[in-house]
């Protein structure tokens, strides 16, 4: 059996997108991993499954699977690719759509210039909702933000914790490019204080409206861009009094613009979405790959 797929990226964060409306799909984690494998599959940071929603107040549902096969709550770059996918395939003619994801409802708008704006919802800071178990960790307050300290590779990492539908721990570094993200990232990601693991962000402040960011994503490793990570970093910087909205976030994959009006307000993310190529998966071969 053959299954059509579309390869896309949002600022270098790449996805395999599957139309679960045309063909119902129920893959195992092993099969998702096989598709995401860059040697034996198509290759992707994450995979997006487009489905119809059973809710009358939304247009679509989509599910997000990490490179390791695990399903996750939200993905900002994936949301932008999702909008382009359903628009290009003629599944909707709306400029603004409402979609259901694991953690709630998102509103997505295709701009006239092809950029996509995503209403990412209001950030959450309560530790229990990330979840985050700080116990007796050292703390400090900067502006409206409370940070907690972890000892990572002999360095003190002061972390701002925020959920953008998925958990993030953000620290400010002097030089994002030189920082050992691939060494410290996995230690933060899997630290015991984060029971469901965490996305680790490393933010360099350029000026009050611009940062450089690298993110070690939960279940995916370092990626070229992370939309929810960009939102979390901008929010953390604004709460700490280091940044003002809007914030230009420069990643290895490109730039995103993040706007946030403050406590209780939604975070608005604007950025590109690009189709790279289309193809077909051989499901029989995929099952064999997944079995090994």
Swiss-Prot record:
Residues carrying the site annotation Could be important to modulate the pK values of the two catalytic cysteine residues: 168, 217
Listed InterPro entries: DAP_epimerase_AS, DAP_epimerase_DapF
GO biological process: lysine biosynthetic process via diaminopimelate
Location of the protein in the cell: Cytoplasm
Catalytic reaction(s) noted: (2S,6S)-2,6-diaminopimelate = meso-2,6-diaminopimelate
Quaternary state and interactors: Homodimer.
Family: Belongs to the diaminopimelate epimerase family.
Protein name per the record: Diaminopimelate epimerase
